[in-house]
């Protein structure tokens, strides 16, 4: 409101629950309620998701909470290059952006372009092109989807397209629809519980737009509808992995 572009941090995205009134009722709605006279170009970075053994209150994936609030933009990078590019785009955006960083990806290494690097919000990234099935993934699920795609090709002769959704609001429906139409099959992979996850939204869009082009049902790979455990064995069973993705695709292909 004073011309600055603050970048705030919430260490664990679970704690959005503590400040949700401010985020959902004030920050998200100010531009609309002032007829565009007041902009809030705020970026809130937050550690999101499981896999780090932090337990039920520090491991939730809450990006689907934010998707339902008009006025908020929502992104979740999976690579070091996209962290730089999406963060730059988020800071330049006139609207508030929730920037979710999957905690288990903090140690990821990869090439990062030098100098200015901006990745447009609302643009998905097709990481791998295939002919038999399209897999949509986000954040930690992206490398797992890529691993699954390699296994599917090498061991089962199934060619998979992998899309890094990376921007949930705005959502790149054009790329998702185009790539799904090419293969006729869609699998979404996410850390959210099955009920009301972002995969359900993508599934509904694809069903509405491409129903007669699909060669099978849309399959969602998710966590179960239970709190994530701090136990290694239990958390590993809950969060989707490459093997579960392979099984889901094989079932669809059969």
Question: Could you say what each language-model-derived stretch is?
Answer:
Residues 37-43, 51-53, 103-254:
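Thiamine diphosphate
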Residues 1-144, 160:
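Conserved thiamine diphosphate
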């Amino acid at each position: 409101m004073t011309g600055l572009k603050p970048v705030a941090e919430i260490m664990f995205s679970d704690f959005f629950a503590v400040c949700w009134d401010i985020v959902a009722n004030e920050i998200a709605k100010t531009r609309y309620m002032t007829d565009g006279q007041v902009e809030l170009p705020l970026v809130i970075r937050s550690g999101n998701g499981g896999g780090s053994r932090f337990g039920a209150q520090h491991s939730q994936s809450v990006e689907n909470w934010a998707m339902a609030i008009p006025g908020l933009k929502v992104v979740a990078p999976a690579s070091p290059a996209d962290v730089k590019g999406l963060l730059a785009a988020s800071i330049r955006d006139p609207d508030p952006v929730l920037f979710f960083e999957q905690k288990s990806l903090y140690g990821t290494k990869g090439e990062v372009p030098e100098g200015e690097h901006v990745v447009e919000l609302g643009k998905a990234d097709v990481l791998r092109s295939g002919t038999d099935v399209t897999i949509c993934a986000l954040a930690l699920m992206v490398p797992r989807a890529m691993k699954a795609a390699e296994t599917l090709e090498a061991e089962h002769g199934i060619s998979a397209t992998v899309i890094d959704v990376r921007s949930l609001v705005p959502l790149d429906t054009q790329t998702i629809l185009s790539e799904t139409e090419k293969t006729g099959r869609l699998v979404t992979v996410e850390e959210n519980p099955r009920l009301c996850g972002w995969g359900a939204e993508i599934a509904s869009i694809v069903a509405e737009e491409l129903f007669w082009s699909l060669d099978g049902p849309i399959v969602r790979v998710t966590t179960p509808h239970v709190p994530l455990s701090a136990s290694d064995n239990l958390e590993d069973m809950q969060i989707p992995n490459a093997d579960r993705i392979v099984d889901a695709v094989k079932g669809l292909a059969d």
